[in-house]
Amino acid sequence: TRALAVPGFSEFPTEHLSDLAFVCFTMYDATFNLPIAFPPRAHRNVLAEVWARVCVQNFRLAETEKYAHVTYFFNGGVEKEHACEKRLLVPSPKVATYDLLPEMSAFKVTDKVLRTIDEGETDVLVVNFANPDMVGHTGKLDKTIEACQYVDTCLGWITKRMREARGITLITADHGNAEQMIDPITGSPHTAHTINPVPLHLIDEGSVGMKLRSGGALEDIAPTMLALLGLEKPEDMTGRDLRELE
């Protein structure tokens, strides 16, 4: 982009193209000062902002590979911590590819989660397990199965401790990967994300007769979490509370 359209480029000789109309697909670099087909949009009243306004004590935990997902991305593209927000980064293991260590740092993350539950000082924990996605990217089916088994074990411990603490657990994902390890057309290893529907599990021992509505979408998770906390969703949120209460 710089060589073709940014004045002052000097890394190597270039030819000025007077009849070139250069449009960036997205904003790759703000210093380019070029037209953008799909400029970034500001996200208003995301879940983290609502929590901050009423001081919901929330704790974000993940290992290195997914730390940005529970902080920067969860906050709508904002790096700075909000009020009443705590963060903990657990280092990912130093290996060439994660099929060499499918457990990654899942057990270390889980230890921190269990300790936080026992302390009882946090309203919401946001946790991301990297294993199914990061090991899934290697295309190694047997190691991806191991990765899922490790996370299943960790979720079992967390869910048990949450039930003992009379808390509510939501388990979901923002995309697929590990569920499709073989390309159905070529038969080759499938290493990319998928757009398959993802599961949503809501474990709440205190809700008798509660069911989840059909046809849910990712946009419904934030309104559901706010409803579980007894908070109103802002108008900017287009999703709905997924619970059906009898």
Regions of interest found by a model, annotated:
Residues 1-246:
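Feature captures the catalytic ectodomains and active-site-proximal regions of enzymes
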